[in-house]
Amino acid sequence: LGKRMRIARAMPNTAIAVRESMTCIASNGPDDKALEMAKLLFNDVGKTLRIREEDMLAATALGACGIAYFLRAIRAASQGGIEVGLSAKNSLAMAVQTAKGAACLLSVGGTHPESEIDKVTTPNGCTISGLNCMEHEGFSSAMIRGITVSAEKAARLYRKE
């Protein structure tokens, strides 16, 4: 397309439907109008983050595919609630609001996940017991590996174009 043509590439996610997308935007110019126009458009339907073009595949895996991973975690939490006796309706409502609250603690408070986790864990408590069980079952490793595999697949699909 040449250097005179300014292009902004955007990768939103499906939360765009409720104006809560995380849209990553890359541009072929350092300070171009295409980028500003894209940011203006996508800021209306969520948050935007300017990234380097070479980070777009990783952003696809985390920002676009990642929404499914967080939804799967919410579904699993809801199923756990049902397993311990909650109704399906109440369990899903609790899982959804708890996930939303956790995300807000980080986005509004600007804290790191571990500092928020530390606030709810107590020695010999039920939270640390549950966290340790999840880690022994591979929770973090599975999430990390899923994102890595998605980025690898995105790279293969991109090369086919």
Predicted regions and their residues:
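Internal alpha-helical scaffold of NAD(P)-dependent oxidoreductase catalytic cores
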Residues: 2-6, 22-59, 69-109, 153-157
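Short pre-catalytic strand/loop immediately N-terminal to key active-site residues, enriched for Gly-Thr
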Residues: 8, 56-61, 113-118
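Active-site capping/gating segments
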Residues: 9-24
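A short acidic, helix-capping loop that chelates divalent metal ions and anchors anionic groups
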Residues: 17-21, 58-60, 129
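Thr-Gly-centered strand-to-loop micro-motif
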Residues: 26, 65, 130
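A generic short alpha-helical patch detector that favors 3-5-residue windows
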Residues: 65-69, 93-94, 119-122
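NAD(P)-dependent Rossmann-like dehydrogenase/reductase catalytic/cofactor-binding core
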Residues: 96-161
